[in-house]
C-alpha cells in the first residue's frame, strides 16, 4: 500500500529526531494521544482527511487541540508539518509505525496471547518470563479470550505464531484424515 510507505517514512523521520533527546516514550504518548483524539471524533477525523477544507483551517483546528492538551514543541511542529504536507489523515498509522521503531530500540516486544478461558495471573507471569528469556526482550502481553479455540493457547510474537489450540489440532487431524481417504 502506498500510504504505508509514506507513513513509515514520516514515522522514521520523527523517530530519528526524537532519538536526539532519547524521549521516545514521551513523544509516542503525545503522538498516539493526539491520534486517539482524532480517531475518537468521527467529524474531526473526516474534517482533517477531507481535501476540500483548506490547510489553514485544519492547522487552526490542530493548534486549538494542541493548546488544550499541551505537548512538546517537537510533537507540535511535527503535527503542523503533517497538516502542511496533507498527511494528518495518516497520523494513526504513523503512530503505529513509530511504536514499532520505539519497541525495537528499547528492546521490547508486544505479545498477543489468546486462550479459550481466562488465564490465572501466575500462568500469565510464567508465559511472560518464558517469552522474555526466549526473545531477550522485555514483553508486553495482551491477553484475549477466544472461546472458538476450545482449549489451549495461541501466542503471537511479532510475525511468529505459536498455535497450541485444540481448534487447530482438530483441524490438522481433519486434514490428515481427508488426505488419507
Curated annotation (Swiss-Prot):
Major localization listed first in the record, in broad terms: membrane
Binding partners and assembly: F-type ATPases have 2 components, F(1) - the catalytic core - and F(0) - the membrane proton channel. F(1) has five subunits: alpha(3), beta(3), gamma(1), delta(1), epsilon(1). F(0) has three main subunits: a(1), b(2) and c(10-14). The alpha and beta chains form an alternating ring which encloses part of the gamma chain. F(1) is attached to F(0) by a central stalk formed by the gamma and epsilon chains, while a peripheral stalk is formed by the delta and b chains.
This protein's encoding gene: atpH
Molecular function (Gene Ontology), one example: proton-transporting ATP synthase activity, rotational mechanism
Record function comment: F(1)F(0) ATP synthase produces ATP from ADP in the presence of a proton or sodium gradient. F-type ATPases consist of two structural domains, F(1) containing the extramembraneous catalytic core and F(0) containing the membrane proton channel, linked together by a central stalk and a peripheral stalk. During catalysis, ATP synthesis in the catalytic domain of F(1) is coupled via a rotary mechanism of the central stalk subunits to proton translocation. This protein is part of the stalk that links CF(0) to CF(1). It either transmits conformational changes from CF(0) to CF(1) or is implicated in proton conduction.
Organism: Syntrophus aciditrophicus (strain SB)
One GO cellular component, as annotated: proton-transporting ATP synthase complex
Membrane topology reported for the UniProt record: Peripheral membrane protein
Record's protein name: ATP synthase subunit delta
Cited InterPro entries: ATP_synth_OSCP/delta_N_sf, ATPase_OSCP/dsu
Presence of keyword Ion transport: yes
Family: Belongs to the ATPase delta chain family.
PANTHER family cross-referenced by the UniProt entry: ATP SYNTHASE DELTA CHAIN (PTHR11910)
Keywords in alphabetical order: ATP synthesis, Cell inner membrane, Cell membrane, CF(1), Hydrogen ion transport, Ion transport, Membrane, Transport
Amino acid at each position: 500500500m502506498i500510504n504505508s510507505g509514506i507513513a513509515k517514512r514520516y514515522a522514521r523521520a520523527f523517530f530519528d529526531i526524537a532519538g536526539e533527546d532519547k524521549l521516545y516514550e514521551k513523544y509516542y504518548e503525545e503522538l498516539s494521544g493526539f491520534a486517539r483524539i482524532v480517531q475518537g471524533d468521527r467529524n474531526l477525523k473526516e474534517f482533517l482527511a477531507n481535501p476540500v477544507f483548506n490547510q489553514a483551517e485544519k492547522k487552526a483546528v490542530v493548534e486549538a487541540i494542541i493548546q488544550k492538551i499541551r505537548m512538546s514543541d517537537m510533537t507540535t511542529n511535527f503535527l503542523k508539518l503533517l497538516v502542511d504536507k496533507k498527511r494528518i489523515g495518516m497520523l494513526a498509522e504513523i503512530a503505529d509505525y513509530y511504536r514499532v521503531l520505539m519497541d525495537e530500540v528499547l528492546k521490547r516486544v508486544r505479545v498477543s496471547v489468546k486462550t479459550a478461558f481466562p488465564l490465572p495471573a501466575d500462568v500469565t507471569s510464567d508465559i511472560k518470563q518464558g517469552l522474555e528469556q526466549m526473545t531477550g526482550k522485555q514483553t508486553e502481553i495482551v491477553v484475549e479470550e477466544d472461546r472458538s479455540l476450545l482449549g489451549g493457547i495461541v501466542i503471537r510474537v511479532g510475525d511468529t505464531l505459536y498455535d497450541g489450540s485444540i481448534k487447530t489440532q482438530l483441524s490438522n487431524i481433519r486434514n490428515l484424515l481427508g488426505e488419507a481417504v
